Amino acid sequence: MSDKLILPSWLSRGIEEYFPIKGIDQTFSEIIDDAKKNNKKLRVKLGIDPTGTDIHLGHSILFKKLRAFQDNGHIAVLIIGDFTAQIGDPTGKNKTRVQLSEKQVKDNAKTYLTQLGMGKPANESILDFDSKDKIEIRYNSEWLKGLNLNSIIELMGSATVSQMLAKEEFNKRYNSQVPIALHEFLYPLLQGYDSVVVQSDIELGGTDQKFNIAIGRDLQRHFKQEPQFGVLLPILTGLDGIKKMSKSEFNTVGLTEDSLSMYSKLEKVPDNIIPTYFELLTELDLSVLNDANPRELQRRMALEVTTLFHGAEEASKAQSNCEKLFLGHKEKVGEIPEISLKDIVFPVKFFYLLSSLKLFKSSSESKRSIKGGGVKIDSQKVINPDIVFDSKKDLEGKILQIGKKIIKRFEN
């Protein structure tokens, strides 16, 4: 029997993988069962690098699982990577990240904690901040900023270059002769050292974090600690049903979005990702997927997720208002004037695209409007004028809104 099959449902739901199956003395399920029987609080680590200002539904999966551990008697150890964020996790990147300033990182961290519900009652927040015995919030600058050269050399001596090059992103860049900065090799070691300092029993992460979590296990072993278990959750597919949820793909739902915006986006997701959204974003029994038609499932899922983040009353209002808008304006999408992309040379920066389409008098005016939050794509503000669109497919069919008056639909 797979060890996963005997895990409690609150833990097994949505998990892509955990490792190892068996620790030094016990399997993962035995660790969980033993903790319950003996009222032992496991230390469950989740690290977040505040490299941006907004949390979206893709991020929320990990926080929901961390909350499940809290609700079942364990300690959430939330690591704010204020030091590591200034380096930048190379995971998923084909080039060196731009380093952030200390002030940028601190400001971002404040917005993250606010979005997670800090200051709100436990029944209105994503994490339980009320019960001090259920959460520890640590900033890794506490221990990383003061590391001396001897300590850094000891960390670096616990891993090998060949081990680092086994990481997919490093391997690709090395083989393609794309530069890898030495400080990027240090990132997984610093994340792993966080686990040593907080003595985590379990670390949560997306499937793309397996390498970094495994490094944490190695470092705990190096420092004579019992290695943590890794629990990996899927990377959520975005609203387009194809690419991972990411602001750069304009396929996200942000936690700060109002209830109408959240509901209206979710009720239009493609059929192929509805089951995944039900499993990862709601608490409903998955048997609801068996009989209902896709349209009913879209509405049910959108209502449940909006309820989770805005409450039942706001979610119900959003559903009602969305239906009124649909009934009153269902023909109007086809009436939105098109704007052709046929003469645009891709790849192209966003500000240059808009000025090339004669939507602004100059590139500088285009930049100012974008930075000021006056431009949206599919109801989502785009505030980075330098974002690059690789091809027409990135924009075809999407709705561009500039201020309150200009609305266009991108077409080839």
Swiss-Prot record:
Disulphide-bonded residues: none
GO terms of molecular function: ATP binding; RNA binding; tyrosine-tRNA ligase activity
Main location: cytoplasm
Binding-site residues, ATP: K247
Start and end residues of each S4 RNA-binding domain: 348-411
Keywords: Aminoacyl-tRNA synthetase, ATP-binding, Cytoplasm, Ligase, Nucleotide-binding, Protein biosynthesis, RNA-binding
InterPro entries listed in its UniProt record: aa-tRNA-synth_Ic, Rossmann-like_a/b/a_fold, S4_RNA-bd_sf, Tyr-tRNA-ligase, Tyr-tRNA-ligase_bac-type, Tyr-tRNA-ligase_bac_2
GO cellular component entries: cytosol
GO-annotated biological processes: tyrosyl-tRNA aminoacylation
EC number from the UniProt entry: 6.1.1.1
Keyword Iron attached: no
Motif 'KMSKS' region positions after renumbering to this chain: 244-248
Entries under Pfam families matching the protein: tRNA-synt_1b (PF00579)
Subunit structure as annotated in this protein's UniProt entry: Homodimer.
Function as written in the Swiss-Prot or TrEMBL entry: Catalyzes the attachment of tyrosine to tRNA(Tyr) in a two-step reaction: tyrosine is first activated by ATP to form Tyr-AMP and then transferred to the acceptor end of tRNA(Tyr).
Official protein name in the record: Tyrosine--tRNA ligase
